[in-house]
Amino acid sequence: MKDKRAELLGKYPVKKLLVKLAIPATAGMMVNALYNLVDTFYVARGAGEVAIGALTFAFPVQMIIMAVGLMIGIGSASVFSRAYGRNDREKMNNVVNTAIRIDAFLSLILAVIGFLFLDQLLTFFGASTSNIEYAKDYLSVILIGLVPLSLSMVLNNLARAEGRVNIAMYAMMLGAGTNILIDPLFIFDEVTFCGTTIPLLGLGVRGAGIATVLSQIISFSYILTKTFSKDSQIRVNFKNWLDIHFETVKDIIVIGMPTFLRNSLGAFLAILILKLISFYAVGDSDIYQSVYGVINKMIVLINYLKQFQT
């Protein structure tokens, strides 16, 4: 299996290899974008249109943590790929260990900051008196899943760098599919099926957050077990968490920084638009912010569809 992947990456025609690697990655991200729309639909039906604002305010926070995960993931994948081409196993393991450690550290720091300053962040984002409680309910849960979310992005990129693109796709699809299935269980009070009323948990927007975090943990568990299976060349030393190679950190960040800037600028743009809505909206701004959140998720899905076509 390892020799087959090495031959694929080293000798396969570039154009065919690009299609073979790109389609699973784009398909997985497209399903991920679609589930975000479904998540919004469930929240609107179960908690009302004002509650969609909770997902809207969570978007910049998730974008920033995704920017960190992509920075570490893409940077480490590039360094790993070069070591993979040289068959430098020591460097490969060094990159993986360093990437996981710094990503876990950075995402944990961001999650702690989010918990400590949640009220201040939401006020700064422009949350109104109508939707700030919804946003607090949702984000207080979502912050728990930031570390596995960010680590999943790192492991997804490393799996692709090793030529195991299907594993990354399955991980994203597993997380999205799980979220779509369990969202109603946590959000709705009850559901009627074949004339029978079935009681559910009825946690509203907090339930949407719980379902999202659980799906992220399931996706992370899958990619974790597959990434470090016997068929993989990726190995992690879990004993010494302070064993970080700063030269490797520099290489990873230099390569991944443009990706971080691009995604974090998207988060800051979302914050700016939310603040403008709260300032200029006629009457309560909560509905306008919810509409912006829905449009934003549709734009993300359309962008992935465009990537799939190209």
Residue ranges and their predicted role:
Residues 25, 33, 60-63, 98, ...:
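Residue-level recognition of pore/gate-forming positions within transmembrane alpha-helices
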Residues 1-22, 80-147, 194-257:
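Short alpha-helical transmembrane segments in multi-pass integral membrane proteins
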Residues 103, 159-185, 206, 210-213, ...:
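Alpha-helical transmembrane segments of multi-pass membrane transporters/permeases
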Residues 179-183, 220-224, 301-304:
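Hydrophobic transmembrane alpha-helices of multi-pass small-molecule transporters
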Residues 16-77, 81, 254-278:
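Signature of the first transmembrane helix
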Residues 34-53, 122-129, 187-195, 199-203, ...:
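Helix-terminus/linker motif at the lipid-water interface of multi-pass membrane proteins
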Residues 27, 39-43, 55, 80, ...:
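Hydrophobic/aromatic residues within transmembrane alpha-helices of membrane transport systems
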Residues 52-112, 149-168, 274, 289-310:
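Small-residue-rich hydrophobic transmembrane alpha-helices
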